[in-house]
Amino acid sequence: HQLTAAQSIEIQPHAARVGERWFTDIPMAQAVDVLAALCQRQSAAQALPVRQAALSHETHEGALTQDNFWQTLQTFIRPGDIILADQGTAAFGASALRLPAEVNFIVQPLWGSIGFTLAAAFGAQTACPDRRVIVLTGDGAAQLTIQEMGSMLRDNQHPVILVLNNEGYTVERAIHGATQRYNDIALWNWTQIPHALSQNAQAECWRVSETVQLAEPVYGGSGCARH
């Protein structure tokens, strides 16, 4: 979005601009304090959002779709989780999740560098060993930093890693080169990756292609192939 000067506030180290008017000899800290107070006053005047009812654990039939995947994941999240969403499909879908109390949501939209989540998840689980870490990543992003899964297995960490296997760089296809080969990636046998990265892998892996198959990894039910 393009904002005109009249629609914006600019804060510099020793001056501030409100609309077209500049105010000098104002320290940045003081200007930020004033702006924060104004923002709080404005937010207090806004109506609170209506809390939606919790989703049920009803399992949908048929092929796994974006809608069914994110609806199921919504019921899986619990208070205190740490959720990391990689760039692309994962971040776009996760942005609509309703987060319970004490959940940390880590996403990196500014630079848009794919592949950060696996390494960041290793750090998050190291810093918070008693919290559940959930990773949402695409297959293309995961291939860039998959070696950090070996670090997780070495340290006996147990994050939940959900790889959205789109067989390539889906966001790049949408931006440029929808049918170009450079947006294709090598197809991996993802359920065997933990065993390749650790001699003593204590990992449970599932391949999910239908919505009902999410019952095993998410709800502890049955119906999908465990590897």
Short names for language-model regions:
Residues 49-130:
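Active-site diphosphate/adenylate-binding microenvironment
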Residues 10-11, 83-87, 106-107, 135, ...:
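General beta-strand structural signal in soluble alpha/beta enzymes
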